[in-house]
Amino acid sequence: MVFSYYKKLSAAQKRIYEQSDAIITVPLPDAGELQLLIPLLSSALTREDREQVEAVCRKLTLGMADRLAVPPLRVKVLAIRPSASWGELHGLYEPAEGRASAVISLWMRTAKHRRVVAFKSFLRTLLHELCHHLDYELYKLPDSFHTEGFYKRESSLFHQLIKEQLPADPNK
């Protein structure tokens, strides 16, 4: 399945889109060690501790970058999401391009109600922005498009980091 904007892409962009769409998982070595950071992130968000949220996000992204052998990147966690008529900005990936490293910016509060973003939404936003980094640095794509494969890669990382506790099976 291709998204509606696909038909507006140039032939070269369509090739990049198709390459991106074909990659659906990101195998994350030793994810178990990174899973230990997830409760810390959840707790820091619950406590509304921006500095701790940023520190845990940095550890998480540096750990993933190291395991995936891509350049490290900086993470900034900011207060209230920017918004306009187009909606709210959840996260932003800025490639290195002249900087020492790429930067992910995340906002931990919604624009309208200024509430702390739900934990899973916040984590997915972090992983979404990291996937842009992986498109450039791991997969060496010249551009990073939102494809079905892109969203599957984001989910792949999410499910490797979040091990949902399933209810106990009464038959076992």
Where are the language model's segments positioned?
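A generic structural signal for well-ordered alpha-helical segments enriched in polar/charged residues
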Residues: 62-66, 132, 156
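Active-site scaffold of zinc-dependent metalloenzymes
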Residues: 81-120, 133-137, 146-157
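Short alpha-helical catalytic segment bearing the HExxH-like zincin motif
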Residues: 121-130
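Flexible, glycine- and charge-enriched loops at secondary-structure boundaries
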Residues: 50, 120, 143
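N-terminal low-structure segments adjacent to metalloprotease catalytic domains
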Residues: 1-51
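Short histidine/acidic/glycine/proline-rich micro-motifs that form metal-
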Residues: 47, 139-141
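Auxiliary, metal-adjacent structural segments of Zn-dependent hydrolase domains
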Residues: 49-102, 161-170
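Post-HExxH zinc-binding segment in Zn-dependent metallohydrolases
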Residues: 141-172
